[in-house]
């Protein structure tokens, strides 16, 4: 794919503001310009950005229904009611379930957890899950990373005398489920100061409120922050505001003293001797946790994440790692098949979206294939497979285009859907696939901007080699953890040439090692 470089030189006013901030905090004006692009304009704001403090976390009781949720949880514990912690089968859901279960289990024993089966139940709260809760005497379900659209299922549970506390971060519909409490900063009536928490992050805020209400010291929550960091990185939520605080301290926990389960995954990933970054979570830790729900059942991931014995955790981690190897093989084969289908589309050059359907594809991998298609063809992609009488699938998008709104536009054709700006899940009757394909393409064509269909590399700053000093690199590392809204900066140096020693390296010869010359100065 050919990428277009996009660079907007700073204005005179921006350069002057960057130099002023540079004098105030003592770092390069180039990096100060990056700070200003992140909304940081003073020394005090820079200090909070570079050294996030847990004391700056928002009061959890600012979230709508938090007082009701804590009161209902306290009531359940006081009555000795059976509690079920229920969550989605992806990384965000399984880390959320592990976090809430591990914390509450310290104070209460009549508690269990449940992860729905991707293939038999599908995403979110299922009637089968409600029936399991009822059959085991559960009176309160804490549902994490899903539930905000489960009006029918939670109504069904209410008829059986089961209350729900929803901890979700997905966009709600106009009608909310009849739950005892709904914790979701994306509620239209939300007064919470930050709306981009992960599902696990919402679970953490619930436990923070519970601890606060019951006189439990905050330091008892900090060992759980490694799970929050894993969820933030894996669910690709913004890493600014409250998420930056949670991710920063979660990474410190992950590197200094990870939970037994995560330590086992770290060992299997070959990360035991290095400093773990958000990229390591995205590309190594997260996919292994996800593989459990993709290939088998997400409950195995929770079993691992709450494990207290390292030898047992290592066995479970190795088993999940084998699922990940299976996942990679499926991913490779399905992506090759998908590419052939797309390349043979007669109108590919005119299309602004991709929708493909194959009855035989593995449901657990279609989201990855959709991501691959988006990267290769640089347009929103929906990949569908057949589950019983429904076409179920995943959608992924390009930068700047809201694929959730595109899917919502076709909601009358759908049985179920949910997600975020850049990723969503959906299901429909098989006979609706052609009309969905037409309507989805129509919406994308009418709403996507020309620049959103071109692969671009956004250049953050132009610099000379002499700007790259040890102090520059040291200060740049302070921008960690990187992620959405705090991406890794891309720098450009112009008028350089190859010194003549370049060579291709790497297992698949996918990298190049070279010396470049810039104004008679060399680097390698």
Predicted features and spans:
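Acidic-glycine-rich active-site phosphate/pyrophosphate-binding loop
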Residues: 75, 171-184, 516-521
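Hydrophobic helix-and-loop "lid/oligomerization" segment in the mid-to-C-terminal part
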Residues: 2, 10-140, 160-161, 211-435, ...
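Short alpha-helices
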Residues: 99, 177-216, 221-233
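Accessory interdomain/linker segments of ATP-dependent helicases and helicase-like nucleic-acid enzymes
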Residues: 459-523
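Intrinsically disordered, low-complexity regulatory tails of plant transcription factors
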Residues: 150-151, 235
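Short gly/pro/ser/thr-enriched loop/turn and capping motifs at secondary-structure boundaries
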Residues: 119-121, 150, 170-175, 189-191, ...
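A common structural junction motif
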Residues: 411-415, 443-449
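Generic beta-sheet signal
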Residues: 114, 144, 167-169, 183-185, ...
């Amino acid at each position: 794919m050919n990428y277009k470089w996009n660079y907007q030189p700073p204005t005179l006013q921006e350069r002057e503001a960057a130099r002023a901030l540079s004098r105030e905090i003592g770092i390069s004006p180039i990096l100060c310009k990056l700070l200003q692009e992140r909304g940081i304009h003073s020394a005090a704001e820079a200090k909070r950005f570079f050294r996030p403090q847990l004391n700056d976390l928002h009061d959890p009781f600012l979230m709508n229904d938090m007082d009701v949720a804590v009161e209902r949880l306290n009531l359940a514990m006081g009555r000795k009611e059976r509690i079920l912690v229920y969550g989605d089968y992806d990384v965000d859901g399984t880390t959320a379930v592990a976090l809430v279960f591990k914390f509450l289990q310290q104070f209460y024993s009549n508690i269990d957890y449940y992860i729905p089966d991707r293939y038999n139940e599908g995403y979110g709260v299922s009637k089968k899950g409600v029936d399991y809760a009822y059959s085991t005497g559960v009176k309160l379900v804490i549902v994490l990373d899903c539930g905000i659209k489960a009006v029918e299922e939670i109504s069904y549970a209410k008829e059986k005398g089961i209350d729900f506390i929803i901890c979700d971060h997905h966009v709600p519909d106009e009608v909310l489920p009849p739950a005892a409490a709904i914790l979701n900063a994306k509620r239209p009536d939300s007064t919470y100061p930050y709306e981009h928490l992960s599902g696990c992050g919402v679970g953490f805020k619930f436990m923070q409120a519970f601890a606060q209400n019951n006189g439990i010291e905050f330091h008892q929550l900090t060992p759980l922050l490694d799970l929050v960091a894993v969820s933030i990185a894996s669910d690709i939520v913004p890493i600014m505001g409250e998420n930056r605080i949670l991710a920063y301290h979660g990474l410190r926990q992950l590197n200094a003293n990870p939970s037994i389960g995560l330590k086992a995954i770290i060992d299997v990933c070959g990360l035991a001797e290095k400093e773990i970054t958000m990229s390591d979570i995205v590309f190594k830790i997260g996919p292994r946790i996800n593989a459990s729900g993709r290939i088998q059942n997400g409950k195995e991931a929770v079993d691992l994440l709450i494990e207290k014995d390292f030898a047992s955790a290592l066995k479970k981690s190795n088993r999940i790692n084998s699922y990940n190897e299976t996942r990679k093989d499926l991913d490779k084969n399905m992506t090759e098949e998908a590419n052939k289908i797309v390349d043979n589309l007669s109108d590919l050059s005119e299309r602004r979206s991709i929708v493909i359907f194959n009855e035989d594809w593995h449901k657990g991998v279609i989201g990855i294939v959709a991501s691959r298609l988006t990267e290769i063809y640089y347009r929103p992609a929906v990949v569908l497979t057949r589950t019983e009488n429904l076409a179920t699938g995943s959608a992924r998008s390009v930068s700047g285009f809201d694929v959730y709104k595109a899917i919502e536009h076709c909601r009358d054709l759908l049985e179920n859907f949910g997600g975020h700006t850049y990723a969503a899940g959906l299901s429909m009757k098989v006979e609706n696939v052609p009309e969905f394909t037409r309507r989805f393409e129509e919406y994308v064509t009418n709403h996507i901007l020309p620049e959103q269909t071109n692969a671009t590399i956004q250049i953050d700053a132009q610099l000379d080699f002499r700007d790259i000093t040890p102090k520059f690199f040291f200060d740049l590392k302070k921008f960690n953890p990187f992620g959405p809204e705090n991406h890794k900066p891309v720098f450009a140096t112009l008028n350089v040439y190859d010194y003549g020693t370049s060579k291709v390296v790497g297992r698949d010869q996918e990298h190049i090692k070279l010396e470049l010359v810039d104004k008679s100065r060399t680097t390698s």
